[in-house]
């Protein structure tokens, strides 16, 4: 298996630092079969240094804190420099800053991972594609005998889309307030949105 070969960028800069796109893409990654892999720093939305040669731009030190060398090392100098320019400056974007912020990328990462872990269908269920009438809308269902099926629904476009119409009431696992969509009413899909739905 190969990881991070060929792409010289981190995820957040590729997504123009857009949290909606980040959430939709990570929800998609975590709902597909297989073992999820996060590249270090992506759990806090770290940026990259495109001026470094080869793939070194996305291998900069992990940004643990606003301390010297981003809290990564007490050495006088690290092999690769820390990112010190906005919007990915280590002094403002680091684990310590995000640790207690319920709206941070780190909190969203933890929420996605915990929600996935709590659903047997997302961990090891079979995948069945669901047809939609819109090329920008991706839908599939994950099923297992060990728990309820999860309908995964994504709008991968920059404009709202009409969603599918559920046959039963469904709860959105990705809506922190536990939003319920009633049977027979279309689920509206905001731009770059993700939904994990259970009956």
Regions inferred by a protein language model and the residue ranges of each:
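Short, flexible beta-strand-to-coil junctions
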Residues: 144-145, 177, 199
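A structural detector for beta-sheet-dominated domains
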Residues: 65, 130, 165-168, 190
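A conserved amphipathic helix/loop scaffold
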Residues: 154, 181
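C-terminal beta-strand-rich structural cap/linker in extracellular carbohydrate-active enzymes
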Residues: 183-199
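Loop/helix patches that line or flank the sugar-binding groove of alpha-linked glycan CAZymes
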Residues: 1-150, 156-161
């Amino acid at each position: 298996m190969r990881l991070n070969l060929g792409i010289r960028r981190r995820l957040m800069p590729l997504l123009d630092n857009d949290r909606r796109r980040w959430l939709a893409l990570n929800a998609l990654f975590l709902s597909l079969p297989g073992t999820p892999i996060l590249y270090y720093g992506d759990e806090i939305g770290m940026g990259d240094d495109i001026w470094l040669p080869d793939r070194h731009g996305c291998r900069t030190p992990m940004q643990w804190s606003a301390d010297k060398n981003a809290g990564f090392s007490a050495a006088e100098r690290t092999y690769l420099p820390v990112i010190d320019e906005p919007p990915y400056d280590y002094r403002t974007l680091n684990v310590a800053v995000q640790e207690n912020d319920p709206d941070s990328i780190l909190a969203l990462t933890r929420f996605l991972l915990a929600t996935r872990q709590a659903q047997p269908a997302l961990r090891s269920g079979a995948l069945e594609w669901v047809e939609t009438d819109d090329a920008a809308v991706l839908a599939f269902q994950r099923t297992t005998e060990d728990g309820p099926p999860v309908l995964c629904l994504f709008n991968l476009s920059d404009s709202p889309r009409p969603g599918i119409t559920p046959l039963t009431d469904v709860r959105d696992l990705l809506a922190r307030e536990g939003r319920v969509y009633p049977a027979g009413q279309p689920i509206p899909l905001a731009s770059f949105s993700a939904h994990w739905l259970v009956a």
